[in-house]
Amino acid sequence: TTPLSSKLLFYIYILNGWQQIHDNNSGKALGTQLEYRPDNLNLINWNTYIGDESSSSAPDNRMRYFTDLYWVHNPDGVFSITSCVYAGNQKRKQGNELTNNYWWQANFIGRYSFNESLSLSGRVEYFSDANNVQISAINPNISGFSAFSGGLCLNVKIKKQALLRFDGRYFGAKDNLFIDKNNLPSKSALWLVSNMTVWF
């Protein structure tokens, strides 16, 4: 960690690989983080990742390049905003050539706090992965995955150690990426999810 100024911090990481604890190959990966706090209400963060993703389960994978940029505004206030964009490129060996396989995402989240225990958040998002690097469609006849989503989430804080969430989320796409309640291909899906998080 290196402080570049009173508002700017730089981090560098040596990693085993992409979101993994066990190293799948002999090479290491490199990550960087630049954190900028212009004032007490805003945080702007930029991350990068470069690493060799070849392994026994994905022998054609080569270098992966990834970057994301996110902004957090007024996280402890009555109304807060979080927004993020990211993009990646997975190099793959096909014959004697290396191909570029891109994916990207953008989202915007707003949260309104009624009091210390109750808040409502809304989210809109778009995700595109034309070459199935991160995700594949449930429908085996569809190649690539591109979809948008929007949702509302009610957050109920239970004392200081637990958070209960009720989340409704709609997904839509131009292709039949999803499966409906009749087990048929569909261009949309609706999720209703609840969960509880406990910390100590």
Question: Where does each model-flagged region fall?
Answer:
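Short, small-residue-enriched loops and turns at beta-alpha junctions
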Residues: 19-21, 52-55
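Aromatic- and glycine-enriched pocket-lining scaffold segments that form the walls
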Residues: 1-43, 47
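Outer-membrane beta-barrel pore domains
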Residues: 44-48, 52, 58-200
